[in-house]
Amino acid sequence: MSHHPSGLRAGFSSTSYRRTFGPPPSLSPGAFSYSSSSRFSSSRLLGSASPSSSVRLGSFRSPRAGAGALLRLPSERLDFSMAEALNQEFLATRSNEKQELQELNDRFANFIEKVRFLEQQNAALRGELSQARGQEPARADQLCQQELRELRRELELLGRERDRVQVERDGLAEDLAALKQRLEEETRKREDAEHNLVLFRKDVDDATLSRLELERKIESLMDEIEFLKKLHEEELRDLQVSVESQQVQQVEVEATVKPELTAALRDIRAQYESIAAKNLQEAEEWYKSKYADLSDAANRNHEALRQAKQEMNESRRQIQSLTCEVDGLRGTNEALLRQLRELEEQFALEAGGYQAGAARLEEELRQLKEEMARHLREYQELLNVKMALDIEIATYRKLLEGEESRISVPVHSFASLNIKTTVPEVEPPQDSHSRKTVLIKTIETRNGEVVTESQKEQRSELDKSSAHSY
């Protein structure tokens, strides 16, 4: 018995098929699970009426064959040329089918690897999704709620601080208004004091002018007194000269009228002396009265000037103290305003920071929701891909089952047939019947593994015409 090379190819293809695919992977409940239990049987008439030619069916697990012509064996003699042509055609078809099956095996292996990878990703995404559904939202919600509570508490503290600052600001504003009112009053008093000072300066100037006028008058009166004294002295001298001359004349006249002239001269002298004394006394009294009046006026003006200077100094001291107080109040006001501005800026910055924190938390929450939605979409897309792969794998499984059912036809095992041929002896036909041997081989597979394998032979008699038609 000679073995044909196609039988080796069939065995190699079967081994390559099992080695390529192997046992299907055990996948998760939601993933693709490939389990199939296929039972197929094939029966083929493999015999002839000739006792010298026998055909035996070998093992097969090979790709589908494209030859549709049935193998016909003559009852008396095997046509080797026809078998060779069929064998060449079958080999070409088988090589093409082997290549196609190899490509299908590669694609199927790629799909299996892809399904495994997608199953791993699916399991990881399911774990992440369950964790995100079970923990992340609650934890994020707790974190957000805690952060919001802290922000609300800080906002309440800031609100109370703001109220306190506003109350303090209102009190400072009232104090500032009172200080402004006091400043206005002091400014008004200062203006009144300056006005009085101007008036006093005017009075002082008037008093100074009056004093100068009085001094000038005193000087003129002193000059007049000196002039009157000189005039009086000259008059006295003239009077003495006249008296001496009269005395000389009297001496001359005494001789004649001595008693009358003496009396007349005494009277005249007494009269002139009384007039001179009276004039001198009046001049002295007028001078003393004028001097006393001028002294009183000067004293009064000096007292008024002293009082004006004292009031001016007092007003200057008050103005200086008020100016210092106004400067201090102005500095206090500026410091309070600066502190108020700093508090407002600090409150605005803190409020902006809290608002930014709240916005950041809201953005993180939104991003978490978007990421969760994205994971859900990816999970849905993976489910869709999984369903498509399940459908495609089911389609390939059906195709493979169809191919397995087709390769179970004995024509595909033509390459594995062991043909023992002897030259038939020409004998006259004894009867019109011939025997045929039918070999039925049943193979049961599950998950790509051969579970059971059985063979059954049936022998029957047929007419020669039926055998030839086969």
From Swiss-Prot:
Region annotation Coil 2: where it falls in the sequence: 263-405
Q: Which residues carry this modification: Phosphoserine?
A: S28, S50, S59
Q: Which InterPro entries match?
A: IF_conserved, IF_rod_dom, Intermed_filament_DNA-bd, Intermediate_filament, Keratin_I
Q: From the record, give the cysteines joined by S-S bonds.
A: none
Q: Annotated region Tail: where?
A: 406-470
Segments carrying the region annotation (Coil 1A) are 100-132
UniProt similarity note: Belongs to the intermediate filament family.
Ranges where the record places region Disordered: 447-470
Q: Which GO terms describe its biological process?
A: intermediate filament organization
Q: Which residues carry this modification: 3'-nitrotyrosine?
A: Y17, Y379
Region annotation Coil 1B: where it falls in the sequence: 144-239
| Location of the IF rod domain | 97-407
Please give the clinical condition linked to this protein: Amyotrophic lateral sclerosis: A neurodegenerative disorder affecting upper motor neurons in the brain and lower motor neurons in the brain stem and spinal cord, resulting in fatal paralysis. Sensory abnormalities are absent. The pathologic hallmarks of the disease include pallor of the corticospinal tract due to loss of motor neurons, presence of ubiquitin-positive inclusions within surviving motor neurons, and deposition of pathologic aggregates. The etiology of amyotrophic lateral sclerosis is likely to be multifactorial, involving both genetic and environmental factors.
Q: Name one GO molecular function term.
A: structural constituent of cytoskeleton
Q: Name it.
A: Peripherin
Q: Residues annotated as region Linker 2?
A: 240-262
For region Linker 1, the annotated ranges are 133-143
Tissue localization of expression is:
Expressed in the neurons of the outer hair cells in the organ of Corti and to a lesser extent in type I spiral ganglion cells.
> Which residue ranges does the record annotate as region Head?
1-99
Location in the cell reads: Cytoplasm, Cytoskeleton; Cell projection, Axon; Perikaryon
Modification type Phosphotyrosine: residues: Y470
